[in-house]
Each structure stands twice: as structure tokens, then as C-alpha cells.
Amino acid sequence: MNVLPELVKSNYHIHTNFSVCAAKNMTVPYIILQAKKAGLEKIALVDHDHDNWDELLEKTNYRKNEVQEINPDIDVIVGAELSAYGINKYGVDEDTNEQIDFRLYATNHYHLDFWEHPQNKTAPAYAEHTLQILKNLIVSGRADCIAHPFVGFYLRGILDDFTEVTRSISDNELADILELGVQHNVSWELNTKAIYADPIFAKRLWRIGRDVETTFVIGTDAHQIFEIEERKVIELKLATILS
């Protein structure tokens, strides 16, 4: 149910220190402690595949064992943030993909040097490129959820105004891709950092998504402990922006 008081009980996007970009103190015990303080009932630990190409399954299993040893009184999923780095281009093979418990896919990490770019580096071209990646990813069955969808904030060094990317996506195009997600049981992340960066689009995503009965989850994309925010704080912020 897409009701903010329910959605904010969970945080589906938390990195441990197996992600190079995360703080060293992002350990499983510390994360769980902070999540409990924040009033969360469910969290997902999702480290980047591109930081752990050769050891992804080994490291996710290591984290699973840590969680089992702690036996927390909140629900902790160990998944991964995986890469759809181009049209039909994926960072892990199908066998590895199937062994990940929660497959949070990023399609717009354009700041990474291996990511595919459209031939023309314009906002409409990036919008079209991202939509095509998403369409193919969704029908592939690889993804459980899409991380920070559509937003162009990883294009800050290329576009003068990264919000032009989402403005280049029509309401009909947005509805169509969200409906495709519904048909293939793919959820979409309400990524708080993306919402703060592009609030006008966030309102469109929220409105149209609810119209087509999209499944949303909330993630703070936490790389530091303080980014595992209290659920009441997140609810207040999102209610203000999305209303």
C-alpha cells in the first residue's frame, strides 16, 4: 500500500563498508543499531556490484552470516545494488543474479567510466536511453526494484541542468514504464536523495505511480550512519515534497 506512514517503516537502500563509497563504520552491527534507533522495521543491505565484481556472492553470504549471528529483532535483507549499465548490458551474469535475495538495479550511474552513454549527450537522449535500459531490464526478470529511477543527478558533469532529463520524459511515457513494472512485479525506489535533488519530478513519479498501482519502496541510499534517518523525519520531509 502506497501510504507514507507504512512505507517509511522500511529502508531498502543501505550500503555497508563493502561498498568503496561507504564510510568505514558502516558495519552490520552498527547499521542495525541505528536502524532500530530510527524506528525501522525492515532494512536492505545493498552493496555495489562494481566494487565487488569477483566476490559479490561471497561477500553477500558473509553479510548474511553476520545478520544470522546477530539475530536482530528487525527484518534484514542482504541483497545488492546491481548495474544495468547499458541497453541489455548487465554487471553480473544470470546465475549470479538469481542468487541475490534482493536485486536493486541502477540504470543511471552515468558517472562510472564503464557506463554506456547515448551517442548524443543531450537531456532528451539520456531520457530515451534510460527508458530503453529500463524496458529491457524489466522484461528480463532480473530486477526486484529500480534504484533512484530516471533522475539525472549523475550527469552533473555533462548537463548544465540535470533535471532536464526527467522533464524530457512525458507523463504517458512515465505511466507506460511504471505499468510495465507492475506487470513484471518490479518495484520502484522512492530514493530520498533523488527526491530532494529533483522534487518536481518526484511529485510526478508519486502521482502517476499511484494512479497505475505501482509498488514503491523507500531508500535513503545510506553511505553513512546518519543517512539512516528516523522514519518520522523521512515521513515529514516526503509528505511536504510529494503532496
Language-model regions, residue ranges each:
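An N-terminally biased module of ancient metal coordination in phosphate/nucleic-acid-related enzymes
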Residues: 1-86, 95, 156-168, 176-177, ...
